[in-house]
Amino acid sequence: MQSVLVLDFGSQYTQLIARRIRELGIYSEILPYNTTPESIREHNPKAIILSGGPTSVYDASAILPDDGIFSLGIPMLGICYGLQVIAKHFGGEVASSSKHEFGRAKIMVAQDNEPESPLFHDIPDSDVWMSHGDKVMQLPEGFRVTASSENSEMCAFESFGSKGALKIYALQFHPEVQHTLYGKQLLSNFLITIAGITPDWSSKSFIEHQLEEISRKAGKETVICGISGGVDSTVAAVMVGKAIGKQLHCVFVDNGLLRKNEAEKVMTFLSTLGLRVTLVDASDLFLKRLKTVASPEKKRKIIGRTFIQVFEEQMEQEKFLVQGTLYPDVIESVSVKGPSETIKSHHNVGGLPKRMKLKLIEPLRELFKDEVRAVGRELGIAEDILMRHPFPGPGLAVRVLGSVTKERLDILRDADEIFIEELKSTGLYQKVWQAFAVLLPVQSVGVMGDKRTYENVLALRAVESSDGMTADWAQLPHDFLARVSNRIINEVRGINRVAYDISSKPPATIEWE
């Protein structure tokens, strides 16, 4: 399979570059900016892209690649900071600009170049997305300008003449961002026309490759997989099951913190896939340990430890553990930025492999979230499973604020189900990234049937996002919110007030705990 390497210099758009490349049907991989030429050769890419970054190439602390990457003979495209890296390496001059460019700008494509730039073939003067404070003041020898903007006379250039065979191209703007009108065409021109890549990356080809890999890795050994009912674990389990059949042992732990009727729905669905699944009802154990615990961090840690204990008890003689690790998790561990600050501890089975001396099978570790869903469709997984909203590992424990009891969980389940039902019936469910109800540790005075009430307050939360990293609160219609509130107060005993959360992320997080 032909591939592209994206060297990461710390840009907020690095993952977006990789995703845009894959949308063209070409496999892309992200590696740190300081990856050695030897390592790059081992990957055998057909093209290299240098990402943007937050630093300046003329600073003493500038992050720069190994000079050897420019001698590999592999077509290269520098984006934003990547352009400046190329300019500096080949002897150009980069300095701080008196005018910074952030946001939309218009580029003018050079019209007098002979022959025409292959990168800008069929690209007219158009709007692009800029995000830079430095610019090229002097072009390196052996390069020519291919586009300019009002503030940057050399906002795109390419190797030419004596250096033409290097096939090195550079853009000061971001072709990966949707605001760059011809961004996809520019990437296509570079990867398909210039680098000569034939698109061969698809969900089908990925599945075929993974089935062979899983079968080879597992051999005749048994494999265990913890299933949550979420998209990632379901797709991972189905793929591994397709590869090794009855060698896979799936464990679904009902921790008493699931949504209404979730255990039954998940088991019914999984039974149609021919997977061997053990349902463990550990709800009493989880709720006993969570009794009187109000701290969200303590809740998460208790749930994590209890899950490991319950999971261990279901172990047979398995040698491998399936995990639904996704590509963003892999990138985070190798990126220039390093691991992010922990905002909340994550409940997962990360401690299981080392603790139980298990080897890992991670069939989704090369995929982004949208690609996981595409693979799931190819595997025949039902759309309502694939398009479910994200659900936190600790379940409803972090949506019942304060102490967690069965009574409070049941109140929340009933209210949450009404909210989701209404979203689906009005076609709004797929228009929001995530929606849920939160039971607050607050009671308020109300009046029902001429009687005073003192009952729970419920908050509704719905957000719009593309990746969950940032999010805006969803501006749902007022009449819709009124209908949901009215149903909840009338149908769910124990709630007399409903509020709607209008906080964005940041500063708030999507989940309340």
UniProtKB/Swiss-Prot annotation:
InterPro entries for the chain? Class_I_gatase-like, GATASE, GMP_synth_C, GMP_synth_GATase, GMP_synthase, GMPS_ATP_PPase_dom, NAD/GMP_synthase, Rossmann-like_a/b/a_fold
> Which pathway or pathways does this protein act in?
Purine metabolism; GMP biosynthesis; GMP from XMP (L-Gln route): step 1/1
Q: Which SUPFAM superfamilies match?
A: Adenine nucleotide alpha hydrolases-like (SSF52402), Class I glutamine amidotransferase-like (SSF52317), GMP synthetase C-terminal dimerisation domain (SSF54810)
Q: Which enzyme class, named as a word?
A: ligase
Give the positions the UniProt entry annotates as the active site: C80 (nucleophile), H174, E176
Which positions are annotated as binding ATP? Answer: S228, G229, G230, V231, D232, S233, T234
This entry's Gene Ontology molecular function terms read: ATP binding; GMP synthase activity
What residues does the GMPS ATP-PPase domain cover? Answer: 201-388
Main function: Catalyzes the synthesis of GMP from XMP.
Return the HAMAP family for the record.
GMP_synthase (MF_00344)
Per UniProt, subunit arrangement is: Homodimer.
Q: What is this protein called?
A: GMP synthase [glutamine-hydrolyzing]
